[in-house]
Amino acid sequence: MMDRNIGRKLDGRYEITELIGIGGMADVYKAIDIIDDRVVAVKILKTEFSNDEEFLRRFRNESKAIAVLSHPNIVKIYDVGFTEKIQFIVMEYIDGITLKEFMEQQGILKWKDAIHFVIQILRALQHAHDRGIVH
C-alpha cells in the first residue's frame, strides 16, 4: 500500500519522497526542499491526532523546544507548518543508520562503543537541560 504522503508537496516547498520512520505520534519522511535544494526530514503528526488539542500542543511545544537548541548531537529545525489539515516539522536530515540498527548489526556492543554513544547522548541532554528543556 502506497503511503498517501509520498509525492505530496508541503507549503509548495517540501516534496516528500520516502517514509523513513514511524512513531507513536508522528511519522518521519525524507523530502526535498526545492527552494534550498537540500534533503530534509519532515515529521508529520498522524491524522488521528490532528483534532486532539493535547497532541497538537505537545507537537507544537516539541518544535519550539528543539528550535532553540544548537548542538552537534541534536538535529536542527528548519521550518514548521501548522494548518487545519496538517502539522509538520522540517528538520535536518541525517544520512546513515540509527543507533538501534547499529546495535542490531553489531550484536553485543563493545564497551568502548557503548560509552561513546552514552557520552554523545548525555552531551545533547545536558545542552537541552542547560536551556530549561527536559526530555
Name every feature range the model reports, one short phrase each.
Residues 84-98, 102, 106:
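Conserved short submotifs of the Hanks-type protein kinase catalytic core
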Residues 32-39:
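Conserved N-lobe loop of protein kinases adjacent to the ATP-binding glycine-rich P-loop
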Residues 121-133:
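Protein kinase catalytic-loop region centered on the HRD/HxD motif
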Residues 46-68:
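AlphaC helix of the eukaryotic protein kinase fold
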Residues 80:
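Activation-segment/catalytic-loop signature of the eukaryotic protein kinase fold
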Residues 117-118:
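Activation segment signature within eukaryotic-like protein kinase domains
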Residues 16-23, 28:
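Protein kinase glycine-rich loop
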Residues 21, 61, 69-73, 86, ...:
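Flexible N-lobe loop architecture of eukaryotic-like protein kinase catalytic domains
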